[in-house]
């Protein structure tokens, strides 16, 4: 009898070991994905959260009109699992979008436009040069925000000393950790691709103005920076856009947006397609 009990205990221990190993294997080797594609915005776009002056109309997302002192934001409605606390894994992601900055005068444009990653409960921050995403030029780890800015107005307190319009990567501060000078083509559509490689922690930004079918007339800018997302943003985040105006202004519009992320070591997926 004792021998039978011992055999049963051994069997259950072996079974439990196999079960736990199997669960761990599938957890480590599974992938959680989030994907969506918006090729044309609708007036009642259900998968966006609007903040400030952001709204959709006529197939586009308008963050600000060309008027003074406005802040407009739009967030994807579903939180994104950007890294996993149990495994330590971080998601690879790529997002692409087209946007237009259109000002009455190409010389007097403000303030700019961002794509950002922030806590789920994110709210509009300071306007003007802070682009509705940050409140300080000093590093603030409680911000838990990474942004890619397309900055059209020079602020002496934190912008590059060359005073040029620029693309910047911002980590917990409006003062960019890396910048690339950028010649705004007023009223022209820009194509942007932002990609994050979790293996290297490299965030890559590419902006292209395909203003002609002739290859030599395509203007392109690329910016790279190491950004340890897991050390900056929460495990679950929201992604979105923000734009602001000040004493000078411009209309800031997004015409299309897609996003795809893959997080290894989890076991669920979310996909959405929006025409």
UniProtKB/Swiss-Prot annotation:
Post-translational modification: The mature form consists of two chains, alpha and beta, produced by cleavage of the immature protein. These remain cleaved, yet fold together to form one subunit.
Pfam families recorded: Lectin_legB
Signal peptide segment: 1-30
Residue ranges of the propeptide: 211-217, 270-275
Binding-site residues for D-glucose, renumbered to this chain: 111, 129, 246-247
Superkingdom of origin: Eukaryota
Keywords: Calcium, Lectin, Manganese, Mannose-binding, Metal-binding, Signal
Residues annotated to bind Mn(2+): 149, 151, 159, 166
Database matches in PROSITE patterns: LECTIN_LEGUME_ALPHA (PS00308), LECTIN_LEGUME_BETA (PS00307)
Keyword Signal on entry: yes
InterPro entries: ConA-like_dom_sf (IPR013320), L-lectin (IPR016363), Lectin_LegA_CS (IPR000985), Lectin_legB_Mn/Ca_BS (IPR019825), Legume_lectin_dom (IPR001220), Leguminous_Lectin (IPR050258)
Site (Cleavage): 210-211, 217-218
Residues reported to bind Ca(2+): 151, 153, 155, 159
Keyword Calcium assigned: yes
Additional notes on this entry: Binds two manganese (or other transition metal) ions and two calcium ions per heterotetramer. The metal ions are essential for the saccharide-binding activity.
Family: Belongs to the leguminous lectin family.
Subunit comment: Heterotetramer of two alpha and two beta chains.
Name of the molecule in the record: Lectin
Organism expressing this protein natively: Lens culinaris subsp. orientalis (Oriental wild lentil)
